[in-house]
Amino acid sequence: MKIFHDFSHRAFIFCYISTMKKVFYLKTCDTCLKILKKFNLKDWELREIKINPITEEEVEQMHKLAGSYEAFFSKKSNQIKLRELDPKKLTEEDYKELILDHYTFLKRPVFMTDNEIFIGNDKKNLEALRSYFAD
């Protein structure tokens, strides 16, 4: 947290700038829980997405950071088979709508700050997370 002082007035004005730090996960996902245990998440908001669904604003923030909706769409969701979806035929708008419609369409876990996003459990992402937390 940073504190800025504005000396142009007689009184001090304190402005607090907080950094958004959120983790989106599923408590029934052993992989998510294993990854969460590896990091100090004291200052992070932990969001269990089944209980507290992702909002459209959060999906838009993810899109801005990731560059596409497909980047954080889980092609392993059981809903794909249940809904008889063909992921190859889905559009960016389809990905967005599906992620908002059902929590299992979000690739997990997602670590998101104001400027960075870490999506999923692949090796490259986990290395990037380790580097982020090491700084």
Region spans (language model):
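Cationic, amphipathic, low-complexity segments that mediate targeting or membrane/lipid association
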Residues: 1-9
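Local sequence-structure signature of Cys/Sec-based thiol-disulfide redox active-site neighborhoods
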Residues: 20-41, 46-49
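Short, positively charged and aromatic/hydrophobic N-terminal segments
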Residues: 13-17
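Thiol/selenol-based redox catalytic cores and closely related redox-interacting motifs
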Residues: 52-129, 133-135
